[in-house]
């Protein structure tokens, strides 16, 4: 199997001053191309360290994607490190120098002398075009390893990987079929509870069951070779049966996007009133393109469940909205949810059984509970659901005549 690795460079990445989103993106992208990463390393802006790790990984990896260090400043050392590791010098790539000059001229800017550095490549390097920036990439062969050097700017990195590097890998190597990966997301059950129920299932050869906990949801993932696709799809029915009503969506689209699409398909507009969630619902749904009529964040105040239910019923009528959703303030470990629909208004009062979670986590959980309430109504299910340390203590329904 092809051994593919990644090397991230830069002090800011090494010291945690920025999150290495490029590494996460590449790992996911390559995985779905049948090229799962076998190792990832990070090195700071130190020439000796860079040269050492390039030489080391050249003895183990078939392909190494090096990210960062192709800029015009003194701490951009990737090209020099590659040349040093190979025992050769840097040469000026005249065509890229002219391309950079054109790039700056078209934008009404003068290219500084320091940018010339970005056109200096190891003598044996294969040039790799960057159509969206000034840092060209390049490839070198060092011992057994084909190394690709890429810019750190995420938009430039992704274009180069997708349009330049992946085609070269497909041309040079016989790549396996991409693996099958089935995903679903649950809300309301703990990871250990799900695992206890699912661990009894018999997995096909080479297939693994994965769990990813990211408060307030749990993602279940069944991954395996394409040859086992039929068996995996059959097993997936059992996984969904075991997960039951805790399943809130399949795939990777996300609940706000799926709700947005359902609202649009059924021509429902939505109005929101938030206290405890502080606009989080509006943010998530607006980013997903949901048909929102009006959104408000109001000061927190103590309300009975009936007050919340009547308030959101009136708000739906006043805004001529198809649906209206409310989250009340958080008072005495309790808060209210209410959903006004053409069928009537449904309201829940919940109690937090623990206070150990941060405000941000509690807001995220409550936003998800509200979205799940909406999802369940759209799917014709009972709108009541609980989440571990959140207990439904009261419910009520107002008829649509009110």
UniProtKB/Swiss-Prot annotation:
Domain of life: Bacteria
Protein family per UniProt: Belongs to the CinA family.
Protein name according to UniProt: CinA-like protein
Organism: Escherichia coli O17:K52:H18 (strain UMN026 / ExPEC)
């Amino acid at each position: 199997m092809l051994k593919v690795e990644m090397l991230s460079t830069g002090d800011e990445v090494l010291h945690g001053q920025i999150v290495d989103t490029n590494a996460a993106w590449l790992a996911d992208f390559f995985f779905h191309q049948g090229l799962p990463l076998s190792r990832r390393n990070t090195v700071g802006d130190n020439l000796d360290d860079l040269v050492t790790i390039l030489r080391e990984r050249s003895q183990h990896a078939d392909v190494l994607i090096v990210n960062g260090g192709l800029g015009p400043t003194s701490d951009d050392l990737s090209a020099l490190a590659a040349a040093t590791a190979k025992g050769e010098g840097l040469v000026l790539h005249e065509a890229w120098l002219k391309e950079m000059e054109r790039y700056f001229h078209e934008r009404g800017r003068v290219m500084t002398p320091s940018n010339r550095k970005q056109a200096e490549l190891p003598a044996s390097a294969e040039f790799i075009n960057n159509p969206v920036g000034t840092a060209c990439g390049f490839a070198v062969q060092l011992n057994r390893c084909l190394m690709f050097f890429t810019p750190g700017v995420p938009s430039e990195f992704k274009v180069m990987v997708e349009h330049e590097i992946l085609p070269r890998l497909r041309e040079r190597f016989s790549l396996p079929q991409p693996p099958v990966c089935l995903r679903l997301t649950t809300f309301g059950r703990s990871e250990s509870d799900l695992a206890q129920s699912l661990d009894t299932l018999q997995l096909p050869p080479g297939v693994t069951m994965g769990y990813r906990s990211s408060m307030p949801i749990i993602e279940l993932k069944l991954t395996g070779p394409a040859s086992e696709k039929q068996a995996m799809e059959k097993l997936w029915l059992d996984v969904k049966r075991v997960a039951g009503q805790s399943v809130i969506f399949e795939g990777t689209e996300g609940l706000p996007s799926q709700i947005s699409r359902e609202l649009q398909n059924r021509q429902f507009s939505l109005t929101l009133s938030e206290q405890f969630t502080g606009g989080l619902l509006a943010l998530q749904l607006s980013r997903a393109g949901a048909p929102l009529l009006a959104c408000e964040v109001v000061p927190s105040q103590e309300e009975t469940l009936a007050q919340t239910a009547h308030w959101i019923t009136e708000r739906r009528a006043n805004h001529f909205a198809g649906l209206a959703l409310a989250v009340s303030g958080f008072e005495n470990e309790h808060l209210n949810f209410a959903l006004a629909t053409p069928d009537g208004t449904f309201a829940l009062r919940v109690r937090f059984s623990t206070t150990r979670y941060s405000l941000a986590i509690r807001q995220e959980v409550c936003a998800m509970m509200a979205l799940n309430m909406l999802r369940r109504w759209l799917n014709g299910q009972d709108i009541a659901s609980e989440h571990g340390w959140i207990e439904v203590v009261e419910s009520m329904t107002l008829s649509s005549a009110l």
